[in-house]
A protein has these predicted regions:
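Hydrophobic alpha-helical connector segments
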Residues: 61, 75-112, 164, 168-171
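An amphipathic alpha-helix signature
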Residues: 17, 71, 94, 142-150, ...
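N-terminal intrinsically disordered/low-complexity leader segments
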Residues: 1-11, 153, 208-211
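Short, basic, alpha-helical segments at the C-terminal edge of helix-turn-helix-like DNA-binding modules
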Residues: 64-71
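Helix-turn-helix
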Residues: 11, 15, 19-61
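Hydrophobic alpha-helical bundle segments that form small-molecule/ligand-binding pockets
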Residues: 126-132, 139-167, 204-211
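Amphipathic C-terminal alpha-helical segment
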Residues: 103, 107, 121, 171-189, ...
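Amphipathic alpha-helical segments used for helix-helix packing
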Residues: 92, 107-132
Length: 211
């Protein structure tokens, strides 16, 4: 990945990334041609290759950009929500889930699916480098939950009975599946219902583990 520092060059690079992310989400990685990205971003072939070594290099940069923007967006949404009590670590997990639900609601008019999900489907079986990076993306999502799950488990006295890392990954699986169900059913309440079940499952799991 090539490094640029000038404001104009940075703006051009970000425009290419934004259009690539949009097209990857809408059409998929394999069906999106570099020429389409260049046209959508209004850049020449020379300008494109000034910033990226090729489509693969661009794909990794799209993932990095997506994860950074996702994290920033969720943090900003959380700051506008009522905070949980200091002694309620599970409330921090629920706050993140509520922020995810709000972020999805804000983006429901966008065409195309989740770029992470789309690239996972398209590339995990055919490109080991992308498979590893996409796995890191999902694990990065899981790490947002794990510290709060650790605290909740310690609070319940269930430290020897709950694998918080696998529990965090389970949450990510529910989140990603709920996003797909919401889109395919075109039911904006689908995610809310699934998250309600998830929250109740987490409450009961920790309560059961402490007995």
């Amino acid at each position: 990945m090539r490094t640029v520092k000038q404001p104009r060059a940075l703006a051009t690079r970000d425009r290419i990334l934004a259009e690539a992310a949009r097209l990857f989400a809408l059409k998929g990685y394999h069906d999106t041609k570099l020429e389409e990205i260049q046209s959508a971003a209004e850049v020449t072939t020379g300008a494109f290759f000034h910033h990226f070594g090729g489509k693969e290099d661009l794909g990794f940069a799209v993932l990095d950009r997506h994860m950074g923007k996702r994290r920033k967006s969720l943090d900003e949404i959380e700051r506008r929500m009522p905070p949980p009590r200091e002694d309620d670590p599970l409330g921090r997990v629920f706050l993140r889930l509520d922020a995810i639900q709000e972020m999805v609601r804000q983006r429901e008019q966008r065409k195309g699916g989740c770029v992470i999900g789309n690239l996972s489907t398209a590339l995990s079986d055919t490109h080991d480098g992308f498979r590893r990076r996409l796995a890191e993306c999902f694990d990065e999502m899981a790490r947002e939950f794990k510290p709060h799950l650790d605290a909740a488990v310690q609070q319940s006295g269930a430290a020897r009975h709950v694998d918080t890392w696998e529990l965090a990954r389970y949450i990510v699986a529910i989140v990603e599946g709920s996003i797909m169900l919401t889109r395919t059913h075109r039911d904006r309440q689908m995610m809310a219902r699934q998250f309600d079940y998830l929250k109740e499952h987490l409450r009961q799991s920790l309560a059961a583990s402490s007995t």
